[in-house]
Curated annotation (Swiss-Prot):
InterPro entries: aa-tRNA-synth_II (IPR006195), aa-tRNA-synth_II/BPL/LPL (IPR045864), Phe-tRNA-synth_IIc_asu (IPR004529), Phe-tRNA_ligase_II_N (IPR004188), Phe_tRNA_ligase_alpha1_bac (IPR022911), Phenylalanyl-tRNA_Synthase (IPR002319), tRNA-bd_arm (IPR010978). Belongs to the class-II aminoacyl-tRNA synthetase family. Phe-tRNA synthetase alpha subunit type 1 subfamily. It holds the Pfam family tRNA-synt_2d. This is Phenylalanine--tRNA ligase alpha subunit. Its cofactor is Mg(2+). It is found in: Cytoplasm. The lineage of its organism: Bacteria, Pseudomonadati, Pseudomonadota, Alphaproteobacteria, Rickettsiales. Keywords: Aminoacyl-tRNA synthetase, ATP-binding, Cytoplasm, Ligase, Magnesium, Metal-binding, Nucleotide-binding, Protein biosynthesis. GO terms for cellular component: cytoplasm. The keyword Magnesium applies. Its EC number is 6.1.1.20. Mg(2+) binds at residue 258. SUPFAM superfamilies: Class II aaRS and biotin synthetases, tRNA-binding arm. One of its GO terms (molecular function) is tRNA binding.
């Protein structure tokens, strides 16, 4: 009995004076471990009779419970103290500037496309989309291309191995294919633009095998070149934010328009004329191919290269730089997310 009380006092003295969890663990092993003091007392049970063993065993268990309670209480106190010390050491200074958050930027082609779409939306144009892989009818035949037209040749067009109705499939060479699909599936009047990727077998400073186009179409009664000239003129002035910009319409030829014109611009009278887009009145054969009566409805169409307009507006010299992925170039020419114009009212996708 006296030995048990002595062990309890010794445990209280040692455990209550410890300063850290490591020392507490050492005392736990000393008193309650496999070879500890309390375990040593339990070994004495074998030398006692049944009644003494019962009484002594009860006392040893109470001693063990008291020591465990002391250790548990001390452990909670030490853990709280260590947590406070850790929080004090890891204290965050809220006045220190935060690390700069990395965020992406807007590619010039995306920026330019959104600006172009926004301007056209002001004239009531909606958006139509179509597939990148097309058949011969939508890409050539319906647009009044003759069978021997150079654009149909392998060196100009990317043909695929697959076929549709025994006709070759190809990567569309213009987004005029969208106009054909829209006119076949709907009824006039139409007023929409068709933005998207197009593909031609060409590569130099001003051409890439893949490029972005926006083509526009208006089909209605009593449409004439005057309407086309007005839309193109106002569009150019709005996009380049220059009301004094000069335009000229040069006679040209496209299979799908008649008459046809190419549009040149110059920012001031000392600059050279720069070709920016093609346009014209929709050819009667095109209207016939999509089931529209050309004696009742007329149309105007135009097409432009997004990269071309981006180069002119943002002063980019080489078309190929758009697709090279040079981080230094992108850092210089890219735009922040808040620079993208929101799509104006009346524009639908």
């Amino acid at each position: 009995m006296e030995n048990i009380e002595t062990i309890l006092r010794l445990a209280e003295e040692k455990i209550l004076l410890v300063q850290n969890l490591k020392a507490l663990q050492e005392y736990k092993v000393e008193f309650l471990g496999k070879n500890g003091i309390v375990t040593g007392e339990l070994k004495k049970l074998g030398s006692l009779n049944e009644q003494e063993r019962k009484e002594f065993g009860l006392k040893i268990n109470k001693l063990k419970d008291k020591i465990q309670n002391i250790i548990r209480a001390t452990e909670e106190i030490l853990e709280e103290q260590e947590l406070k010390l850790k929080l004090a050491a890891d204290k965050i200074d809220l006045t220190i500037p935060a690390r700069r958050y990395k965020q992406g930027s807007i590619h010039p082609i995306t920026q330019c496309s959104e600006e172009l779409i926004q301007v056209f939306s002001q004239f009531g144009f909606t958006i139509e989309n179509g597939p990148n892989i097309e058949n011969d009818f939508h890409n050539f035949t319906a647009l009044n291309f003759e069978d021997d037209h150079p654009a149909r040749q392998m060196h100009d067009t990317f043909y695929l191995k697959g076929q549709e109705n025994n006709k070759p499939l190809l990567l569309r060479t213009h987004t005029s294919t969208v106009q054909i699909r829209a006119m076949k599936s709907g009824k006039p009047p139409f007023r929409f633009i068709a933005p998207g990727r197009t593909y031609r077998s060409d590569s130099d400073m001003t051409h890439t095998p893949m490029f972005h186009q926006i083509e526009g179409l208006v089909i209605d009664k009593n449409i004439n070149m005057g309407h086309l000239k007005y839309v193109i003129t106002e569009f150019i002035k709005n996009f380049f934010e220059n009301s004094n910009i000069e335009l000229r319409f040069r006679p040209s030829f496209f299979p799908f328009t008649e008459p046809s014109a190419e549009v040149d611009i110059r920012m001031n009278k000392h600059d050279k004329w720069l070709e920016v887009l093609g346009c014209g009145m929709v050819h009667p054969n095109v209207l016939k191919n999509v089931g529209i009566d050309s004696s009742e409805y007329q149309g105007v169409a135009f097409g432009l290269g997004v990269e071309r307009f981006a180069m002119l507006k943002y002063n980019i010299k080489d078309l190929r730089q758009f697709f090279e992925g040079d981080m230094r170039w992108l850092k210089h020419y890219n735009f922040g997310s808040f620079d993208i114009p929101s799509l104006a009212g009346g524009l639908t996708k």
